[in-house]
Design a protein with these regions (language model features):
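C-terminal ends and interior cores of transmembrane alpha-helices
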Residues: 88-101, 299-311
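Helix-to-loop junctions at the C-terminal end of transmembrane segments
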Residues: 66-78, 163, 276-288, 373-374
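Residue-level signature of mid-helix packing/kink "hotspots" within the transmembrane helices
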Residues: 60-68, 152-153, 270-278, 362-363
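Helix-loop boundary and gating motifs at the non-cytosolic
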Residues: 10-60, 226-229, 233, 237-255
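Cytoplasmic helix-loop-helix junction between adjacent transmembrane helices
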Residues: 111-148, 336-337
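Juxtamembrane intracellular "pre-TM" segments in multi-pass secondary transporters
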Residues: 1-12, 192-229, 411
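C-terminal membrane-cytosol helix-exit motif in multi-pass small-molecule transporters
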Residues: 177-201, 392-401
């Protein structure tokens, strides 16, 4: 085997396999985006929006916590073992949903799915960063998120189509095949990338030994104003995504939109998000991170308000396009902003902290929007989330700074 080298061209075969693998990771969660809220309402007879969105709370909390642990562990034992365990945890998910006699089975399935997404998606992100080195991070992250979220969109549409013609549980048979293929790719063809970190580390400033997780958690969460801005934006970004995952299908169904069309609207948002990240990731390398993040949050807020204020299919499609555009501006750019400030030897742990806060947003968004929807209505919940998204973008515009010339100190 040839010695490791940094660069996209030098590692193109493995990089391409990781892009493909992340499409399978995204496909697993895309199966749920259209049908699970409708399943709770129509087959399990749930009337509480908070109860229906409980599966997103289970997913978000699990994913947030395991992001933190998986990233730190990957610095110690390697990326590939974490990736494989993530896919092993995905195997029971479709079976639990297909056979579920009670809603708590769905919650349990989403605990496992959250663990799968935390381990498998985190590792594909970290492994791509390891391979390409410091100069192409935006491109690497854009391609990674493109593959994952375009697959989310594709599977959202496919699951809606299948559900409209065959039943709400039938799409999850696809999940069995996705999980098996993802596991086989991880075991057979994906290689460990920790050796590439050793190549990059000498070019970064040297300091004391890598800090403990507690110190990294503080620095990433609040100790640096730019990293704080990124973490709060990540949380609010997934807060509005959690709301759209749980409430949009119910909101559209309340306006008598057929399941197949609900699937189309739900597919547009992640598909646009995924497709445009191919451009926005590299653009952040040229234009900087702050403007794309701040304006991206503002565009998202506009799309959410359009969805709730203009109840028509065309407006909902346009709202989904705007949400997808805004999220594409934000998602890979936030990851790159975190990486700008972290030393290579603890970069994975810092990304894990950011992803903890970001994915906790799923749980916060689902719980908050569900409680508001139960108290004063679906429309009010959507309005509140749009306002929070706008406020988050303004915070980024006010306090985020450009990347430091060197990774921040931890002491």
């Amino acid at each position: 085997m040839s010695p490791p080298r940094l660069g996209l061209r030098e590692n193109l075969p493995q990089f391409s396999l990781l892009v493909l693998l992340n499409a399978f990771v995204g496909g697993m969660v895309g199966l749920e985006r259209t049908v699970l809220p409708l399943l709770g309402e129509q087959e399990f007879g749930l009337t509480s929006k908070t109860a229906i969105t409980s599966f997103i709370v289970s997913f978000g909390i699990t994913k947030a916590i395991i992001n933190l642990v998986a990233a730190r562990l990957s610095d110690r034992i390697g990326r590939k073992p974490i990736l494989i365990v993530g896919w092993l945890l995905a195997l029971p998910v479709p079976f639990l949903i297909i056979m579920a006699p009670a809603w708590w089975w769905i919650d349990l399935a989403n605990v496992l799915l959250g663990a799968n997404q935390a381990m498998a998606w985190s590792m594909t992100v970290i492994m791509k960063i390891d391979l390409v080195g410091p100069r192409r991070r935006g491109l690497a992250l854009g391609l990674n998120e493109f593959a994952g979220y375009f697959a989310v969109g594709a599977m959202s549409w496919i699951s809606g189509y299948i559900a409209a013609h065959s039943g709400l549980r039938q799409p999850f048979y696809l999940g069995i095949g996705i999980a098996i293929i993802g596991l086989l790719l991880s075991v057979v063809v994906i290689r460990e990338t920790r050796g590439h970190v050793a190549l990059e580390a000498p070019s970064a400033p040297h300091g004391p030994r890598p800090p403990g997780l507690g110190r990294i958690f503080w620095v990433t969460s609040a100790g640096n104003v730019s990293l704080f801005a990124a973490c709060q934006a990540g949380l609010v970004n997934n807060l509005n995504d959690g709301m759209s995952w749980g409430l949009y299908p119910l909101f559209f169904a309340a306006h008598a939109l057929p399941i197949e069309r609900i699937g189309t609207v739900k597919a547009v948002y992640p598909a646009v998000w995924g497709l445009l990240q191919v451009a926005t990731g590299p653009l952040s390398d040229r234009w900087g991170r702050k403007g794309l993040i701040a304006w991206g949050m503002i565009v998202q807020a506009g799309g959410i308000w359009l969805t709730v204020l203009v109840p028509s299919y065309a407006a909902w499609i346009l709202g989904a396009v705007l949400q997808g555009l805004g999220t594409a501006m934000v998602y890979p750019t936030l990851l790159a902003a975190i990486v700008d400030h972290a030393h290579p030897t603890w970069r994975a742990s810092s990304l894990g902290v950011y992803r903890f806060w970001r994915d906790l947003g799923y749980a916060v968004g689902a719980l908050l929007s569900g409680l508001i929807a139960d108290a004063i209505g679906l429309g009010a919940a959507i309005h509140v989330v749009a306002a929070l998204t706008l406020a988050s973008g303004l915070v980024v515009g006010a306090i985020m700074r450009g990347p430091a010339p060197a990774p921040i100190a931890t002491r």
